[in-house]
Amino acid sequence: MKAIINIALLVCTGLLNPVFSQETGTFKSQQLKNKRVKDAYATKWSGLEAELKAKKISPNAMEVFVRIFKKEKELELWVKNKSDAKYVFLKKIAVCASSGELGPKRKEGDYQVPEGIYDIASFNPNSSYYLALKVGYPNKSDKILVDGKRTGGDIMIHGNCVTIGCVPLQDDPVKDVYMLCVEAKNNNTSPRIEIYPCKFTAENSKYLEENFDDGKNNFWANIKPAFTYFEANKTPAKFSINTKGAYVFSN
């Protein structure tokens, strides 16, 4: 078990296998030079493309939006055409392992999965844990609210089911997530990722209030409007981050 945890630590701190960074040619064509990406497209793309077409989504004009809910251990995939106003739900994928507790990541080595609004910073088609997408942590808010000097980093959505701060999926469904994000990146769009402690239902909100301290509940109250806005409008909320590290929503 100790050996497994040590390997997971290397994965979540980016010490195993550098991320892919070539820029020549189209992004997708460069990704397809890697065996795991090529295999993913060969075995799963036709089915995924059919799912997209059933939603009237064109892969050549697609944008992708990802939501992750820690308590529910779910990753949601939403898609839309660039010309569409609203996203449509595509599928839900189980997050197959977890670490830490509900609440944001505030320092290096706390084993926490971040919470907040991010993008995909980079793609790793040769990860030690199959395929990996680097979450854009720390963002401006995280850097301001850090507990100490070191935020930590290299938080990944990846294959396999071992983690101490990343978001692990099984190898088969991570192919779908990876391919969708490759397609979106190839369309010159950056998939947005929103990570929440849970879905902010009345029951869950009561659970958070009764079981966690004021600091966490104040943070959750700050990010909840993004969840609520998307639930109502099926488009992500516009936001900025102020000098105190708080999200400020402008919709």
Report each predicted region and the residues it spans.
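Exported/periplasmic cell-wall-interacting domains
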Residues: 109-251
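A structural boundary/capping signal
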Residues: 26-30, 61, 102-103, 219, ...
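Extracellular/luminal recognition modules and glycoprotein regions
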Residues: 23-59
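Bacterial Sec-dependent N-terminal signal peptides
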Residues: 1-27
